[in-house]
Design a protein with these regions (language model features):
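Glycine-rich phosphate-binding loop
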Residues: 164-202
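C-terminal binding/interaction regions
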Residues: 125, 166-170, 174, 204-248
């Protein structure tokens, strides 16, 4: 439940469309609903600006479907990250309108399509191999009510591809830059723009990349002062933070 749905609930009571007892029944599950294996946080949108997001890894299809359907019944947008097709099959039996975004490995249910962001969030990937992480950021930012554009495969091995898109970079209010290997691209982008750059190290690379650790350390030591960093492969975290920045 978010602030808008709470206002509607109170308004329905005021207009006589809903009895006080019905309203109490709907509010009973605030702040959370105990399913035994999960305590579903229905209050999170009021506190944090976005409903609880389901991390699909290590959850059974039945668990994901149960949590997803409980959130969907409260009239909010729902997102499950790191989800697979078996989990989606279980979800779509319970939630009509749920969609699976294969590249992002995300299940989405979007009821609220209002735009809350003040500008454009641009998601950049260094290579094609970084796109799944970038797409997780795209899906997250879109579901949080942002205008999102993407720019893929513009890494430093062919920096002219990036420079040819300086106009696109310049239109962004917030940038998310995903890169593996040595993780140089966020620093390059940071030197070209005057807005926040959220760097996402990916686990793409050969042995000494250490599954994204080399990129993470490189990004944390960026000389570009507008670069901040999230965890390895954490496109969701980048999309979430970019959305909060874009609302300021």
């Amino acid at each position: 439940m978010n602030a808008e749905s709470l206002r509607k609930l109170f308004d329905d009571v005021r207009r006589g469309k809903l009895t006080p007892d019905d309203a109490v029944a709907r509010l009973r599950h605030l702040p959370f609903e105990d399913l035994g294996f999960a305590k579903v946080d229905h209050h999170r949108a009021l506190r944090a600006g976005m409903p609880e997001v389901i991390f699909g890894e290590r959850k059974t299809p039945a668990q994901v479907a149960a949590i997803f359907s409980k959130l969907a019944k409260h009239g909010v947008n729902v997102l499950a990250t790191r989800a697979d097709e078996k989990q989606f099959a279980a979800v779509k039996k319970k939630v009509r309108g749920a969609e699976y975004r294969e590249l992002a490995r995300a299940i989405v249910f979007q009821r609220d399509r209002k735009k809350y962001g003040k500008g454009i969030v641009t998601v950049v990937s260094a290579g094609t191999g970084d796109i799944p992480v970038a797409e997780e950021a795209v899906v997250t930012a879109e579901l949080m009510g942002n205008d999102v554009q993407h720019l893929y495969d513009v890494g430093v091995a062919g920096v002219h591809r990036l420079l040819a898109n300086r106009e696109t970079l310049g239109k962004a209010r917030v940038l998310i830059v995903c890169a593996g290997m040595e993780g140089a691209l966020p620093s390059v982008v940071g030197g070209l723009v005057g807005v926040p750059v959220i760097a996402v190290p990916t686990s793409v690379g050969y042995g000494a990349a250490f599954k994204g650790l080399a990129a993470l350390l490189g990004m944390m030591n960026s000389c570009a002062s507008n670069v901040s960093v999230v965890n390895i492969d954490n496109g969701f975290g980048a999309g979430y933070v970019a959305s909060l920045i874009n609302r300021l």
